[in-house]
Amino acid sequence: MGKLTAYIGKRLLQLIPVVLGITFLSFAMMRIAGSDAVMELYGDKGAVAQEIIDAKRAELGLDQPFLVQYGSWLKGLLTGDMGISYVSGKNVFDTFVSKLPATLLLTVLSIIATVVISIPLGIWAAVKHDRFVDYFLRFFSFLGNSLPNFFVALLLMQLFSIKWKLLPVISNGTTVQSAILPTLTLAIAMSAKYMRQVRATVLEELNKDYVLGAKARGVRESVTLWKSVLKSSMLTIITLLALSIGSLLGGTAIIESIFMWDGVGKLAVDAITMRDYPMIQAYVVWMAIIYVLVNLITDILYHVLDPRIRLGVQEG
């Protein structure tokens, strides 16, 4: 337990330089891009006096040197102040937090749907290796991996919302019903990828000596499958889930934009479009934290499931 605690502490400390490095790079890239946030704000208001533009730029601190701007933002971050949105004039932290429930709901539903679909089908395909079921599921996996998410989203919207009128076209991010189409869109793509990986992992395990030996001793295949093979395959499944959870918690920009799902992905797209620097930086910090924490939890689960896998802690 002591080593595990030390490892967790070490990884959390590593989060600090990671966040600093990523935020500095994103801050620099936004400035290098040359776009003017103030001009974006006044772009649809016709001719605006240069004095007004200069005053707004000074108010936002955009007339300061790059390092001064970054230092000011970093100082605010360390005191819990992520600034004010250039576009809405609202507190960035409060706005960002208000979008998290919609993203969390979509993440949970998508992961549940993916697990329910991909793991049983992947195992089934492996057990029925080189039979009709296997060929059919492999075709489904290939098709799901080939179709872009936006195409699947538009197809589902056309069928379920416009043609059959079963589900709302525009999601409001507050009900399960409005989450069905974006969840299906994400689950189809992830299930196609996961099913192929689960099939390959389970098939590899089924051909190992301990499984063949159990079969020779008369142990039922179903018993070996559920007690040994699936447990050995869990590391691969956990890796896939961890990667997907990280990206989903960051918001899926295209899907959220298509379905008008009011989550952090759509918020990030809108912020980038309007050059809302404080909001973009908040999103960058969120993504950095999420990926470090997801990787940390994954490493710990690896160690719990298979103690032979050593954590990155020096022997005492």
Regions found by a protein language model. Name each.
Residues 18-71, 165-181:
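Hydrophobic alpha-helical transmembrane segments of membrane transport/permease proteins
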Residues 89, 138-200:
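Membrane-water interface segments at transmembrane-helix boundaries in multipass membrane proteins
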Residues 66-109:
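Individual transmembrane alpha-helix segments
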Residues 57-66, 82-92, 174, 272-278:
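Membrane-interfacial helix-loop-helix junctions in multi-pass membrane proteins
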